Swiss-Prot record:
It comes from Thermosynechococcus vestitus (strain NIES-2133 / IAM M-273 / BP-1). This is Glutamyl-tRNA reductase. Transmembrane segments: none annotated. Its EC number is 1.2.1.70. Catalyzes the NADPH-dependent reduction of glutamyl-tRNA(Glu) to glutamate 1-semialdehyde (GSA). Keywords: Chlorophyll biosynthesis, NADP, Oxidoreductase, Porphyrin biosynthesis. The gene is hemA. The keyword Repeat does not apply. GO terms for molecular function: glutamyl-tRNA reductase activity; NADP binding. InterPro entries: 4pyrrol_synth_GluRdtase, 4pyrrol_synth_GluRdtase_dimer, 4pyrrol_synth_GluRdtase_N, GluRdtase_CS, GluRdtase_dimer_dom_sf, GluRdtase_N_sf, NAD(P)-bd_dom_sf, Shikm_DH/Glu-tRNA_Rdtase. NADP(+) binds at G189, A190, G191, K192, M193, S194. The active site is at C50 (nucleophile). During catalysis, the active site Cys acts as a nucleophile attacking the alpha-carbonyl group of tRNA-bound glutamate with the formation of a thioester intermediate between enzyme and glutamate, and the concomitant release of tRNA(Glu). The thioester intermediate is finally reduced by direct hydride transfer from NADPH, to form the product GSA.
Length: 426
C-alpha cells in the first residue's frame, strides 16, 4: 500500500482557486464516500481550511490513485483539470507523512507556529474515523502527526506569541484605520475565528463591537466571554444596514456563497464615508466586485502576507529546532510502516519454514523410535524452532529496515521468488 497527499495551499494557489475546492464539514461525508468509491483508493481523508485543501489517501497503485484524486478535485471544483493541475502538489510515501507532521506543527502555515491548525488536523482525523474512510494506515499517519504537533508546541517556543490569521487581520485593520477605539466595528460570524478577532480587538482597546450571526444564541455565547465589552447582537436579516453603518467589518462565516457584493452593498451605502472590510473566510464571504464601490476597501486572507512577514524570521529559526523533533517522529512511523508492509511476506516465509520443520521433525522422530522420541522430543522441538528463528532473524531485520520503498519491494519480491511463496493478506 502507498501513501499520498494531493492538494493545494496558500503557497500554490490564490484564494479564488482555494475557495472553489473547499470541502466544508456538512458535505465532508459525501466527499469521502465519493473518494472511497474509486477502485484504487483504500483509505482517504480531507483536510480543508481557509489556507489549504489536502486529500490524504492510501492507494494500491500510486499513479492511478493520484489520477483518481485529480478527477475528484476537478469534478468537485468544476475546474477543468488542465487549469487546476498547476496549482496542485503531490507528495508520496514518507514525504506525505512528513508534510502532515509539518502541517500539524504549524511549520507549513501562513503564520509559522500558529496553533489552530493542530485542532483542524485532529478534526480531520475524527471525521475520517466517524465516516469510516480511514483504516489502520491513515489512522497511524494522523496519530503520529498529532503527536508530533504536540511535541513541537511543548518542546519549543515556536507557538509563543505567534501571529494568527485573526490577529494579523486586526493588525492590518490597525495599520489602515489607525485608531480602532474610535471606529464603528462589526464582526460577521460567531465561530472560533470571530472570537479571536474580538479578543485581539479588545487587546487594542476596542470597547464596542457589533456581532452579526445566523444564530443569535451563538452570538450571545461569544459576547458572554467578554463582559468588559459592550456588544450589540444582530441576526443576518440586519446584515446590510449594520454593515453600511460601520467603519470596519470583519467577516468569518461558513457561508459557501458571498454574503456581500457590489449590488446588495451598493444599495445600502450612503454618502462618501469609507468602509473597510477584512474577509478571513474561505470560501470568501465578500465578492471582489465590492471594490468597484469607490468608498469600499476589501482585504482577504491573501492580503495578510505582509503583516505576517514582520515576525516570521525569528519563527523560522525556531522551526529548524522543530524539524529535529519531526525527524524523530517520522523515524517512529517509518519503523511501524515498514514492519506492517513486510508482515505478509514474512508470515508466509515463516509458515513455509514451519511446515518444513514439522515435516522433517516427524520423519526424524519416527526413525529414532518411540522410546527416544518420547524422551527427547521436547528438546529436539525447541532446537529446531531456535534454528528456524535464527535463520530468519537477519533476513527479517534487513527487510524491515529497508527505508527505500522500491528497494524494500524488490527485496520482498526476491524472497517470494526464491522461496516460491504465496503472499497472504496482512
Amino acid at each position: 500500500m502507498n501513501i499520498a497527499v494531493i492538494g493545494l495551499s496558500h503557497k500554490t494557489a490564490p484564494v479564488d482557486v482555494r475557495e472553489k475546492l473547499s470541502v466544508p464539514e456538512d458535505v465532508r461525508e459525501r466527499a469521502l464516500q465519493h473518494l472511497c468509491g474509486y477502485a484504487h483508493i483504500q483509505e482517504a481523508t480531507i483536510l480543508s481550511t481557509c489556507n489549504r485543501l489536502e486529500i490524504y489517501i492510501v492507494t494500491s497503485d500510486t499513479e492511478v490513485g493520484v489520477r483518481e484524486v485529480h478527477q475528484f478535485l476537478s469534478e468537485w471544483s468544476h475546474i477543468p483539470l488542465p487549469q487546476l493541475r498547476p496549482y496542485l502538489f503531490i507528495l508520496l510515501h514518507q514525504d506525505a507523512v512528513m508534510h502532515l507532521m509539518r502541517v500539524a506543527s504549524g511549520l507549513d502555515s501562513l503564520v509559522i507556529g500558529e496553533g489552530q491548525i493542530l485542532s483542524q488536523v485532529k478534526r480531520c482525523h475524527q471525521l475520517g474515523q466517524q465516516y469510516k474512510s480511514i483504516g489502520p494506515i491513515l489512522n497511524r499517519v494522523f496519530t503520529g502527526a498529532i503527536a508530533a504537533g504536540k511535541r513541537v508546541r511543548t518542546e519549543t517556543s515556536i507557538g509563543t506569541g505567534a501571529v494568527s490569521i485573526s490577529s494579523a487581520a486586526v493588525e492590518l485593520a490597525d495599520l489602515r484605520l489607525q485608531n480602532l477605539q474610535n471606529c464603528r466595528i462589526a464582526v460577521v460570524g460567531a465561530g472560533k475565528m470571530s472570537r479571536l478577532v474580538v479578543q485581539h480587538l479588545i487587546a487594542r482597546g476596542v470597547k464596542e463591537i457589533r456581532i452579526i450571526n445566523r444564530s443569535l444564541e451563538r452570538a450571545q455565547e461569544l459576547a458572554q466571554q467578554f463582559p468588559e465589552v459592550r456588544f450589540e447582537l444582530f441576526t443576518m436579516t440586519d446584515l446590510l444596514p449594520i454593515v453600511a453603518a460601520m467603519d470596519l467589518v470583519f467577516t468569518s462565516t461558513a457561508a459557501t456563497e458571498p454574503l456581500l457584493d457590489r449590488d446588495n452593498l451598493g444599495a445600502v451605502l450612503v454618502g462618501d464615508r469609507s468602509l473597510a472590510i477584512i474577509d478571513i473566510s474561505v470560501p470568501r464571504n465578500v465578492h471582489a466586485n465590492v471594490t468597484e464601490l469607490g468608498t469600499v476597501q476589501l482585504f482577504n486572507v491573501d492580503d495578510l502576507q505582509a503583516v505576517v512577514a514582520q515576525n516570521q524570521e525569528a519563527r523560522r529559526q525556531l522551526a529548524q529546532e522543530a524539524e529535529g523533533i519531526l525527524e524523530e517522529e517520522l523515524e517512529t512511523f517509518l519503523a511501524w510502516w515498514h514492519a506492517l508492509e513486510t508482515v505478509p511476506i514474512i508470515r508466509s516465509l515463516r509458515q513455509k519454514m514451519e511446515a518444513i520443520r514439522t515435516q522433517e521433525l516427524e520423519k526424524a522422530l519416527s526413525r529414532l523410535g518411540s522410546e527416544f522420541a518420547d524422551k527427547h522430543q521436547g528438546v529436539i522441538e525447541a532446537m529446531t524452532r531456535t534454528i528456524i528463528n535464527k535463520i530468519l532473524h537477519d533476513p527479517t531485520v534487513q527487510l524491515q529496515s529497508q527505508r527505500d520503498l522500491e528497494s524494500r519491494q524488490r527485496a520482498m519480491q526476491t524472497l517470494q521468488d526464491l522461496f516460491n511463496l504465496e503472499p497472504i493478506e496482512a
